Structures are given as C-alpha cells and as structure tokens.
C-alpha cells in the first residue's frame, strides 16, 4: 500500500477492511466525483481498483484515479486479462463491482450483455458470482426513457442493486458520496442481525408554546441514527422514527415526527402492526409540555408564565404492547455520581422492564463522542469515551449476546 493511501486507510471506520472493490467508471461528467469516492471508501478500509472506459479518461485522467486508489488503473483489456484478474471467479476476486457514475448507455449495454469497454467487460465477468451495484447519472429525460427504465428493472430482477440518483436541475444526478459509501457498507457488512426486526428512535422532540415557539433540547439525534444504521448494516429490518430536528439518515424505512404525542403514536402503530425483536429508544423526549398552547403568536415584551404538564412516558408503553421485545432505554442525568447514575438506570429497568439501559451524564449532547455505562439487570459495564459510531457497534455487540 502506498504511503499516501496508508495515511487515510481505515481512518473513519474498519467496516470495509478486507474488502476489494472495483470502481468501474463510465464516461459521465459526474466521474469527477470518483477521486473523492475512492478515497472515502479507503477511509473505511476498502482496497479500491479503478477501471475506466475510454470516454471516462477524457473527463478525468487515469493518473487521478491512480493517485486516489494507490493501484494501477485499467483503461484497456490486454493480454494480462485484467477483467479476469479483478473480477473472475477465484480466491482473490473483487467483493463488489461498483459502476459509478453509470450512463444510460452503460446501463443498457450491461442489461444486454454487451461488453465492449473495460467497464462493461469487468461487469460481464463478475455478473454470475459477484455483487454489482450501479449508481446512475444522466439528464432526467434520459433516465425517464422507457427502454432505459426497462433495462434498469431488468437488471434489478437479476440481482443488481441500484443506488437511486438525486433529481435536481433537470438531471438525475449521481447519489452523494456519503450515500454511496453507506450503501456499499450495507451491502458488504456481515449480517449478524439478519431476520431481526428493529425499531429505533432518534432526535429531540418539540412541544409547542405557540405556533412558532417550542420547548426542546440539545440532542442532535446522532446517537440514535448511528444505532439504526449499524443495525441496518448488520442485516436487520430497521424502522427509524426520527424527529424533524435530528441529523439525516440513510436508513431505508423512516418515519418523521415532531412532538412526544406523534412519536408515541408512531411507536404504538408499529408495535401493534408487526412484531419487533428489538426496540431502542434513543430519542431525547420532552418530559413536559405546555398545558394550554396558544393558538396565535404570544406577544413579546411582557412577563410570561407557562403551566407545564408531564408528557406520556413512551418507554412504559413498549412492553405493554409487546412483552417479549428486547427493550433498550437511555437514561441521561446531570450531577450524579457513577453509582447514582447506575441506580437511576436500574429504576428504569424495574419500572419499564428495560433489558438494557444506556446511561450517561449529558456531556456528549450534540457532539461526535459519548461516554456511557451499559446497565443490565445484573451488571453494569462502563465504556471508555468513543465516537457515537463506535458506541453503536459496541451496543449491538452487547445486544446480540443478550438476545
């Protein structure tokens, strides 16, 4: 591995360590994003090899991809049978072929089994035994062409996974680098939670004082989103109930809510409608709401007294609806010692029937890191300070042991 690649290798996560990815680049102007994409895949531990069509080399120079990946770039198929070396059926073959950004021309060629460029030849070689993902990029009128749509559907039926484009400015623009990386990790990650159904909440609720002002808290939703995405990486069928103020997520099935009442209704609807294996309540839910919300904006410039009332305790409803579900609660407190924090978590276990409580002292609200104590009925395990992504991994490791 070249030195400049070592400097970024697995610096964001180790999700793709040991995975060999062929980045197959057709001749789209969006190919200019491929340097960043390759580097981001490497930051998660991937070994990336670029294959370029002749038209792609007219948009970005092969040297750019050679720098980005730290590997020789395939721009033609020679006597070294590069397509077989990269994607043939052997022990050192690629784990994934990612066609990005895929033009209408390339998609249609792949659908028809035509392999007249290095890109299409590699895909044809890999098709029978290697996962293939395609990220389209073209003008929207081309994407809407009935034959192009037919070819996309044909490939989907054959097991090819498409990363849907963003529709902006009359174009079907290639998906964001963040979404592509997320989908690649989801595709290649070990599926230890396959067959499990998981419900996760994330973000801060809002309780309105008048039509524009509300009571909320400093939660960003990062912890809940990380937990939901980690579960999806591990193969679970995930439903993420996320507040409007939460950071965004790439989880496939999401429900957006705003108030405690809306969140409770969404949770009850899910638990009444289907059986869940795990429920993780990571949202920062308001404990109080205004008893009499104003219908119009309250005028400023004068003292204001608000009468508050408690909101429903969402966690208390979960086991009433599904007694057998594995319930993970969060307990955030200030000014408590570690022993007092553990005691508060155990009270939640007794009251709500939580199987595991993630207890912390609110120091990490809105930040990228967290320091928590995992509390069960008969154990308490303090974890060192770590990123919320790392904590999500540790949490699911613990849950899997307890299921």
Curated annotation (Swiss-Prot):
Q: According to the lineage, what is the superkingdom? A: Archaea
Q: What is this protein called?
A: Coenzyme A biosynthesis bifunctional protein CoaBC
Note the SS bond partners: none
**Note on cofactor:** Binds 1 FMN per subunit.
Give, as in the UniProt entry, the pathway in which the protein acts.
Cofactor biosynthesis; coenzyme A biosynthesis
**What ranges does the record give for the region Phosphopantothenate--cysteine ligase, renumbered to this chain?**
198-403
Cite the EC number: 4.1.1.36, 6.3.2.5
Q: Which organism does this sequence originate in?
A: Thermococcus kodakarensis (strain ATCC BAA-918 / JCM 12380 / KOD1)
Result of knocking out the encoding gene: Disruption of the gene results in CoA auxotrophy.
Q: What GO biological process term is on the record, naming one?
A: pantothenate catabolic process
Query: Species lineage, top-down?
Result: Archaea, Methanobacteriati, Methanobacteriota, Thermococci, Thermococcales
Q: Does the keyword Transcription apply?
A: no
């Amino acid at each position: 591995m070249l030195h400049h690649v070592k400097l970024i290798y697995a610096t964001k996560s180790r999700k793709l360590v040991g995975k060999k990815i062929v980045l197959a680049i057709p001749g789209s102007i969006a190919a200019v994003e491929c340097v960043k994409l390759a580097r981001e895949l490497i930051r998660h531990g991937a070994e990336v090899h670029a294959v370029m069509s002749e038209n792609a080399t007219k948009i970005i120079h092969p040297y750019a991809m050679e720098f980005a990946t730290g590997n020789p770039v395939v721009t033609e198929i020679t006597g070294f049978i590069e397509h077989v070396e990269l994607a043939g059926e052997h022990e050192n073959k690629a784990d994934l072929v990612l066609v990005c950004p895929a033009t209408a021309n390339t998609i249609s060629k792949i659908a028809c089994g035509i392999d007249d460029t290095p890109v299409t030849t590699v895909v044809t070689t890999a098709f029978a035994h290697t996962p293939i993902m395609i990220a389209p990029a073209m003008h929207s009128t081309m994407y809407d062409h009935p034959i192009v749509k037919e070819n996309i559907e044909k490939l989907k039926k054959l097991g090819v996974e498409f990363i849907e484009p963003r529709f902006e400015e009359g174009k079907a623009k290639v998906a964001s680098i963040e979404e592509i990386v997320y989908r690649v990790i989801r595709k290649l990650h070990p599926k230890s939670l396959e067959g499990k159904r998981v419900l996760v909440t994330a973000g801060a609720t809002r309780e309105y004082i008048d039509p524009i002002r509300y009571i909320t808290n400093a939660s960003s939703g990062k912890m809940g989103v990380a937990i939901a995405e980690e579960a999806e990486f591990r193969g679970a069928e995930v439903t993420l109930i996320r507040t409007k103020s939460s950071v965004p997520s790439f989880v496939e099935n999401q429900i957006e809510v705003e108030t405690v009442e809306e969140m409770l209704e969404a949770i009850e609807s899910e638990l009444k409608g289907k059986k869940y294996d795990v429920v993780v309540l990571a949202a920062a839910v308001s404990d109080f709401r205004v008893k009499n919300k104003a219908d119009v904006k309250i005028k400023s410039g004068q003292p204001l007294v608000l009468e508050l009332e408690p909101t429903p305790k969402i966690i208390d409803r979960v086991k009433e609806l599904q007694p057998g579900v594995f319930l993970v609660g969060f307990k955030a407190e200030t000014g408590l010692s570690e022993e007092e924090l553990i005691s508060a978590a155990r009270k939640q276990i007794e009251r709500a029937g939580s199987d595991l409580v993630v207890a912390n002292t609110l120091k990490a609200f809105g930040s990228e890191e967290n320091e928590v104590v995992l509390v069960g009925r008969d154990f308490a395990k303090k974890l060192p300070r770590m990123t919320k992504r790392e904590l999500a991994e540790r949490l699911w490791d613990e849950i899997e042991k307890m299921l």
